[in-house]
């Protein structure tokens, strides 16, 4: 009997306790349009407010919200949505009834008024770091520091662009590019052309992914740079027009007008932009603009440029358009298009070179003068179609992307090279005795196409676990047709030995899957993933009648472990394996000749480069970011310049060199990186980055075993100051010490940018003046191999000044479609958790 009484007592107690909890639910709607407001902030507070926020959730795409398992007590419900009046409602304890939930029904939020009267101000973080990427957001101050999107890329932490415009990411070559998350199957030279033709106002930001997850292509041993083009974030119609003028000296100057137009309503988000640029470049005739020493055995040769002169003109157009349409509350259709034209109708290059030998370096015994003219044009087009479908209230979704891109380029050049012997013993008369002349007329046409289709599936299993999977197929083709004619008795005739056609095809099919889970009250996060890729390639060299086929399969594991000591104190470890596939031209065995002393060729036996990457990183208060990275690359691809030997079946000068790519063995790289990003005061922002990089290279070359190491140091400082009366100042400084690439070494370089600007008429009109300056007096490089030592010096460019004017027009009001939370944040907030 006592046992029965005890059981009944416990049962009644449990029932009584369970009756103290219930769910609170409702819907959030726009009172004027009678439409659901998705992702509204819904907050429960204790009425006394002594403990602050009790629960927080976000409304779903139907405007519905629910707080689960809420204790019986006096509460206050607050609902906030940008552009709408804040809603408050008391929920007294007496509203709680046994066994019943509290249904608040439909809650109508009042719109604040005319869109023109709504002003939303929020300071955007310039540097953001999350799970996989570093994001550098581009605001007006940064965009006005430079004249094009290429120079804007120089400001990104971790990106190194040297004086020769070669790019590295976190100390490594092999960088893959995306635009708005879409892969760009273009070589770096083509991407440079595209960025130089784009106005900086078109760029919303650059995302740096040094450890991309498995949903990304495995291409890029250094990582991925995602170019984020601007999308409209304001309701209604708005836009901007502007023009920028730049001048380096009397030979280098140009201008760039641009315009943007945007439109947003409850269904559409549309944005489009156009820019035009025209640029004149040149260098006056000046002595010693470049000097090259060559040691081969005991022979030392000096090539000295005595009066190099350059002149060129180029112009380009750039268009971009994006649109997304909400089919319903669960699905969205998107379209994007980018088109660009870059033309150089005239280019002139006069390159007289004196040749002398040890010990009489300044008494030339021979010389040559290369006079060339060039006309070129290129255009590129990229199209993208996307569809996203939300599958359930947990934000499970499936997405599909279809992408197409193409690039065409044509270059026509005329070259006349005269070779001289020493005659009178002084540099004024050395060009009087021609012993041989060569003339070439060349046309180089290159066409590339790429099409890809992918499907991605995202499934939150619960609050702690999510699953991702997908597949992608990609087809790429390129055709390079090189036609050469040689001058003979005053007439240009076909030169079959120097003409070339190379066709290349590549197909990559991939599958991936990833699982993320969180433990210990969501403090510990674990992500594991695998990506499988099958690659099929075919290269056809028409002149040699050779065909090269390669088929290989790779799997790419990926691991991420992170632990949050506090919300703003996180430690993470990443591992990834990535690949760098040879570009089509690097596989072409055709030998290209630029002069008697310089040749280049490809390597059909080139293998893909693989890289294991480990990273340990820490973020503190979203201000201080520290990382230690180690990578080991096998079959690393590098271009080597070595003496041209007798294995090539044509006559050549004993001073000739040839450049070609090889798999050099392996390399190890260790990098310590520390970044600081903080608003020191309300109007002063500082971003600083610095560290040290160690690299070690081992390679087996035909005539030498290479074992070299190098320590490099780097730093950058980026600061912005808002002054009274809407003046603003900004400055950027970058330094990198000497760098090594296998058998080559280059000196350090420095870069400085400064900007002053002012806004008028409620920030609608902006004026900006900036200066960009390479602080190196000369750039130097050195190549050592076997018994050859090659040293080069080149003059640095003078500072470039840029002045820009921008006028904004239309309505600027944050649209609710842009206020959607990221999936990860939404999953964490939805449902409010349990007590």
What are these model-predicted stretches?
Residues 29, 41-45, 78-82, 99-142, ...:
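Short, acidic, small-residue-rich periplasmic hinge/interaction motif at the N-terminus
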Residues 48-64:
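Short, acidic Ser/Thr/Gly-rich low-complexity loop/linker segments typical of extracellular
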Residues 101, 105-107, 149-152, 191-194, ...:
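N-terminal periplasmic accessory domains that precede
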Residues 149, 155, 182-210:
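Short acidic/polar hinge/loop motifs at secondary-structure boundaries
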Residues 150-187:
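Extracytoplasmic beta-strand/coil segments of soluble accessory domains associated
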Residues 228-245, 284, 288-289, 305, ...:
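Surface-exposed extracellular loop regions of Gram-negative outer-membrane beta-barrel proteins
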Residues 441, 450-454, 493-502, 607, ...:
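Outer membrane beta-barrel strand-and-loop segments of large Gram-negative receptors
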Residues 500-505, 579-634, 657-670, 792, ...:
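Outer-membrane beta-barrel signature, preferentially recognizing the C-terminal barrel domain
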